[in-house]
Amino acid sequence: MELNELTITKAIVEGFFQKFSSCLETDVAIVGGGPAGLVAGYFLARAGKKVVLYERKLSLGGGMWGGGMLFNEIVVQKTALPILDLFGIRWKKYDENHYSADSIEAVSTLISQAVKAGLTVFNCISAEDVLMREDRVIGLVINWSAVEIARLHVDPLSVRSRFVIDSTGHATEIVRIVQTKVPGSLNTPSGKLEGEKSMWADKAETLTLSNTREVFPGLYVAGMSANATYGGPRMGPIFGGMLMSGQKVAEQIIRAL
């Protein structure tokens, strides 16, 4: 049978429409496709929850692809090895608490396993606002990233979810939106975004887990977003905290659903 250009177009348009329509209402919407968001999506999907992830860029993986300063190796601590083993990511021992892995294998495996577990991903889509009802986040307002980049005056669309995860990293995009729209309402010491502190890898990795929590009704933070929200330091190219934070936020939301 001859390949037909119109049939190719129909298959893409109809397939995307069906996928997008099925995700207008979900249990969880994740914003940010870095390691924390991907791991959260994996565990939520594996638990049978309807979960969607929005990533503003064309590719997922956040800063993990480049390892440290474009040296495409990453480091994780010993406590994160069970997650690497679960995903089938190979690692090498450097010393008793530092283990390295190929960043390309790590990212590509996280993406593949998360999608195969049932996570639906929409790339090139940004969240520009949240849906709010009585001081609770109940969804997202989304638009194509290209619209934002081109500065086009195009109204967005809305999607609903029972919970939202901000895993946008240093940018803390969703937390910043809520802070702007509902000043002083965050579950932080000041009621505001505390801000990211300078590099301190050991402390940052510990705080990433303790800062992974609900920061506003219906809104959770994970990964570097958690540290930036609660005033923790950055950690650099060690990713164990990111992975474990993704698992922790998934477990918290599963209990809440």
Q: Predicted regions: what is each one?
A:
Residues M1-V28, N143-W144, K192, K197-A201, ...:
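Extreme N-terminal leader/targeting segments of oxidoreductases
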Residues K19-V52, M242, A250-I254:
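N-terminal Rossmann-like FAD-binding beta1-loop-alpha1 element of flavoenzymes
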Residues A29-V31, Y54, S158-H170:
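Short hydrophobic core segments
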Residues A45-W65:
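Glycine-rich FAD pyrophosphate-binding loop
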Residues G66-R90:
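N-terminal glycine-rich dinucleotide-binding loop that anchors FAD/FMN and/or NAD(P) in oxidoreductases
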Residues G88-F163, S167:
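Feature captures the FAD/FMN-dependent oxidoreductase FAD-binding
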Residues D166-K181:
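Flavin (primarily FAD) binding-site architecture
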Residues T229-L257:
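A conserved FAD-binding loop/helix module that cradles the flavin
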